[in-house]
Amino acid sequence: MSDHAHSTTGLVHHFDDIEQQHEAGTLGMWAFLITEVLFFGGLFGAYAVYRSAYPEAFMRASSHLDVDLGGVNTIVLICSSLTMALSVYAAQKGSKRGIIMGLLGTMFFGAIFLGVKVIEYKDKWDHHLVPGDNFIFEGNPGGPEQLYFALYFAMTGVHAFHMIVGMVIICWMIKKAHRGDFTPGHHPLVENFGLYWHFVDIVWIFLFPLLYLIGAHSGSHT
Amino acid sequence: MSSTLHTPAQHASATKGAKERDTYLTADYGWKSWLFTVDHKRIAVLYLISIMVFFLIGGTFALLMRAELMTAKGDLFEAETYNKLFTMHGVVMIFFFLIPSIPAVLGNFLVPIMIGTKDLAFPKINLLSWYIYLVGGGATLYVAITGGLDTGWTFYAPYSSTYANTNVAAAAIAVFITGFSSILTGLNFIVTIHKMRAPGMTWFRMPLFLWAQYATSLIMILGTPVLAITVMLLALERTFHIGIFDPALGGDPVLFQHLFWFYSHPAVYIMILPGMGVISEIVACFSRKRMFGYHFIAFSSLAIAIFGFVVWGHHMFVSGQSAYAGFVFSFLTMLVAIPSAVKVFNWIATLYKGQVSLETPMLYALGFIGLFTIGGVTGLFLAVMGLDRHVHDTYFVVAHFHYVMVGGMVMAFMGGMHFWWSKMFGRKYPEAMGQFAAVVIFVGFNFTFFPQFILGYMGMPRRYHQYNDEFTALNVLSSAGATILGTGFLMTIVYFLWSLKWGQKAPQNQWDAKGLEWEKAQSPPPTFNFEDGERIVVTEDAYAYTYEESHTGSGHEVKK
Ligand SMILES: [Cu+2]
């Protein structure tokens, strides 16, 4: 399976010109993101159903999350979006160093986010708040609070998985950038990955209030 | 007309006779050239082989079920075994045969050629989709071997999540994986059709097959991810008992049904829309007429795709859904009949005063029109809440969806395979055998499934391995029909394989058909589809058949 890639322009054999190739890539990424919206949409749908069925339980359960850590992570992710945007900008300007710095920054903030997530998960595990047979909520087993935590882990877990995939792709892109594969006129990978990374951030922007902030006004969180 | 391709592959075959033309089949040899190919035509062939394997597996399950149902007593299989048979039949046939059948085989092969380009937009992703399909299929076979699955293809909670003793989690993961192969195919088609049409190939010059593929692809990318997340939750529930579908913990099993049918009703249109596209091609060709109501057929595909997303609740009329929701879903479901009927009427209007000839593809197309109409109209019966209460979960439902899926999609797939066989492999299938097998399949199909309408109306429930004595006669009829149907399919497979070696060599345009794949591409096409260096420019509408112009409709022979 050879690439058929023309080394100087990056034009792949079955496209007429580089513009058509770029447009196809961008449309493909948008279509993929629409798929992602529906993928998360199923989870958001389940969340909407159960939150409207058990509003109090959801608030009680939500107050066991750490709003401070969630807030820090929100800021961290916004920063990662900024570095990603800077990387795309550098690619347009043709600055190889800028691309790599932006990607490294994105990687750095992504790693912080995941690190904080690990701390949070560990805390839930220690307090028996991971759904399953060991689940204990304020002394009681099971119940709708467990549904909240099931959704919490499913939604943040799927989100974290997307971040991990993103960071693997970043490693690969850094290698490509280092090799000088991206030119001002041809860096579709950087552009399209930027779209992906921003999408993953936006998902978090929805997750944060829906999961962390619904119990905040009860004042019982630590 | 021989072409020289400047591909690496060319060197491999340079030793061949100078007159021999390189085709996508001969461009390169060896298993690597197939397993690592990025040629959409080769990937179509890979898909064809793999879906046929699954078709035979799923068909075997069906025949075993029909064998059990020959007698009223459950004498051949235990109830549990029978449950596994119908579950695996459903899972294999739906996820591994019907959904990929036309899109991944005929669509993969034809979409780039029909729009006049060299390949799909993302050839490697195309190959990846086949590998994902294989992994999902392998996982399903693993489930089948290690104890099977007995939940029905619908995986309804809480049975699947709490009570079933079979390998539900692995099966859910298999379906999860397979979904991504379908998403990637849909993504590829959408981008290809949007961005890679040849100059002059405007949206309204596209063959209707492409409109159908496009609408199908929309459903694939919008619906499949919801199924993925649903079965993921099911696997989590099953493995960790998180309570999401467990009423004891506050979860709601009906939520599973909502999420599941949000995908799985539109999936029905993934399984029928591409078939409708094939029928449009065949009907126009064998009537030698322009398509009647081209725009209506094109937009009805999109309408079906859109309506399809708002009717899922008709599966829950008796699941405790509110009567008002039921009312709305019932009404919306009936609306789907409109675009479906638009297609049927336009096909019939195309036949009207056409120069109709009855080669094998046309026999299948006519069979499709009749059987799909029966399947569709009985679907309307089921959309009516009062009637649905009576026939819900009976053989009436089974007969209904087999008329649509087998009478519709499988007929269309068979018609399409016969229509484009010479294009794919350069040889003709034996025409008389083809016509004979088509009739056998049509007869066998009706004997198999028509009695099930009556059985269902009489009250025979689906998914039981034994039944009351008064249902025996019709069940025997149905089982007898199934053997005829199975024979017909086997005949077809045998003469198709035979024709690969001994079939008559086909000319470029076996049917004197219109369309780039016939007029511009050889049979079989070279690796990049068209003659080297030739830039396809489209100057006329689809289906520019000239029968009407040259002939005002009195009906005698006209020189093509
Ligand atoms: Cu439905």
Segment roles from a protein language model:
Chain A
Residues M1-T222:
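...captures the hydrophobic TM-helix bundle architecture rather than a specific catalytic motif
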